[in-house]
């Protein structure tokens, strides 16, 4: 680390900027940077590329902010305020938010299915009722039956035989409405991304502290920004890849709709397991 300080003092630190970007990319590939969790979240909500980019940038923003907060706090508040001492608490806080998100995803999917099943049962009940009521009037029965059936299905753009597919299209439209055009839901995506980037990087904090101590504040900010840019490239690529893979699979595989209907359950369980894992590590670190 002494050689690095010497290079900075000689003004050669700017040569490390490309290396900082590359290290950020590689750093994003390391375990513990929420790539699996983010991909699962994008798949669960059938997220668009725009939402995947938003998720990755939010995670990078929080990751960078944590580096600055810990570095500056460590300098001006206390020597004990290090990345090693803060990381367990951040892991525990992240675990709580992640578990809450997983439970919300699971509940939202279950509620959507229950609402569809209730609506489908109500449709069948109305169909049987009309049939029994108009049994003695063949002309009226045919007219009422066709009219009621058409009125129920036409907004979905499908026939009774394809009603399940119509529901899936309606469910996809509901997801699009919830996660594309609403401020509240975009806030949920941003919150999830910000939570995913709360774990600090000791290497980035160390570089920033060295630059600040050597009065190379601008260089330190640039190095951290370059590092964060590389991290953003990795996280955004993972999210966009998940979003595109969902879209392509839906076009090429007819059975994908059935799998996609169950995917949010598996995704919420996977995200929940990640939250439990982070919570255990955070709790263990606090107790040490």
UniProtKB/Swiss-Prot annotation:
Regions of this protein lying in the Cytoplasmic compartment: 34-51, 107-188, 245-265
Membrane topology: Multi-pass membrane protein
Disulfide feature: none
Main subcellular location: membrane
A cellular component annotation (GO) from this entry: plasma membrane
Membrane-side (Periplasmic) residue stretches: 1-12, 73-85, 210-223, 287-288
Residues passing through the membrane, by range: 13-33, 52-72, 86-106, 189-209, 224-244, 266-286
Compositionally skewed regions (Basic and acidic residues) per UniProt: 122-155
Protein's cellular compartments: Cell inner membrane
Region Disordered: start-end pairs: 122-166
Function: Efflux system for nickel and cobalt.
Protein name, entry field: Nickel/cobalt efflux system RcnA
Source organism of the structure: Salmonella typhimurium (strain LT2 / SGSC1412 / ATCC 700720)
């Amino acid at each position: 680390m002494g050689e690095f300080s010497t290079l900075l003092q000689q003004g050669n630190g700017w040569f490390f900027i490309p290396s900082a970007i590359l290290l950020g990319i590689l750093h994003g590939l390391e375990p513990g940077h929420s790539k699996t969790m983010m991909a699962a979240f994008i798949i669960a909500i059938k997220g668009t590329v725009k939402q995947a980019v938003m998720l990755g940038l939010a995670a990078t923003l929080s990751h960078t902010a944590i580096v600055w907060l810990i570095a500056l706090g460590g300098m001006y508040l206390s020597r004990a305020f290090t990345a090693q001492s803060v990381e367990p608490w951040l892991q525990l806080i992240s675990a709580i938010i992640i578990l809450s998100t997983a439970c919300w995803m699971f509940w939202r999917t279950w509620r959507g299915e229950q609402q569809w099943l209730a609506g489908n049962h109500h449709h069948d009940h109305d169909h049987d009722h009309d049939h029994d009521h108009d049994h003695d009037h063949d002309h009226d029965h045919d007219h009422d039956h066709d009219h009621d059936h058409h009125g129920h299905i036409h907004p979905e753009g499908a026939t009774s035989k394809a009603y399940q597919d119509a529901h899936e299209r309606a469910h996809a439209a509901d997801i699009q409405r919830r996660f594309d055009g609403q401020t509240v839901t975009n806030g949920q995506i941003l919150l999830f991304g910000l939570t995913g980037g709360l774990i600090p990087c000791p290497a980035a904090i160390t570089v920033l502290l060295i630059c600040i101590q050597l009065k190379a504040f601008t260089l330190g900010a640039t190095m951290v920004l370059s590092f964060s840019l590389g991290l953003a490239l990795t996280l955004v690529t993972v999210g966009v890849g998940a979003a595109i893979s969902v879209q392509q699979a839906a076009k090429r595989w007819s059975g994908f709709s059935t799998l996609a209907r169950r995917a949010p359950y598996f995704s919420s369980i996977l995200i929940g397991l990640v939250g439990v894992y982070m919570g255990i590590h955070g709790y263990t670190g606090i107790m040490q």
